[in-house]
From Swiss-Prot:
Native organism taxonomy: Bacteria, Pseudomonadati, Pseudomonadota, Alphaproteobacteria, Hyphomicrobiales
Modified residues (3-methylthioaspartic acid): D89
Domain of life: Bacteria
Purpose of the protein: With S4 and S5 plays an important role in translational accuracy.
Family stated for the protein in its record: Belongs to the universal ribosomal protein uS12 family.
One GO process term, biological-process aspect: translation
Gene, per the UniProt record: rpsL
Oligomer and partners: Part of the 30S ribosomal subunit. Contacts proteins S8 and S17. May interact with IF1 in the 30S initiation complex.
Name of protein: Small ribosomal subunit protein uS12
GO cellular component terms, semicolon-separated: small ribosomal subunit
Length: 123
């Protein structure tokens, strides 16, 4: 433990919180191009084939984004919009791809929580 004189000479440094979404550069969303669309398996104890895409952003970052909802139309060279938000059981996936924006279509036959999946209001 430092003495009072040591603290006067060199005060304590405040700890900086690390940025959880560094690729966004303090923007709410970023645009990017899919370089690879594939499925991956989650950590234990979960089991599934989660749909993800590797995206090269306009600022040069290459990130992995999760594709939410059932079914998607993404392929290589699709232009997508990305937001922050990790997927807890997929290590390295710290971003979500927005549905219903740019080349990504909304989820078909979605009745509830439509705005989260870019689905239009059913007639």
């Amino acid at each position: 433990m430092p003495t009072i004189n040591q603290l006067i000479a060199q005060p304590r440094k405040a700890q900086k919180a690390r940025n959880k979404v560094p690729a966004l550069n303090a923007c709410p969303q970023k645009r990017g191009v899919c370089t690879r669309v594939y499925t991956t398996t989650p950590k234990k104890p979960n089991s599934a084939l989660r749909k993800v895409a590797k995206v090269r952003l306009t600022n040069g970052f290459e990130v992995i984004g999760y594709i939410p909802g059932e079914g998607h139309n993404l392929q290589e060279h699709s232009v997508v919009m990305i937001r922050g938000g990790r997927v807890k059981d997929l290590p390295g996936v710290r971003y979500h791809i927005l549905r219903g924006v740019l080349d990504t279509q909304g989820v078909k036959n979605r009745k509830q929580r439509r705005s989260k999946y870019g689905a239009k209001r059913p007639k």
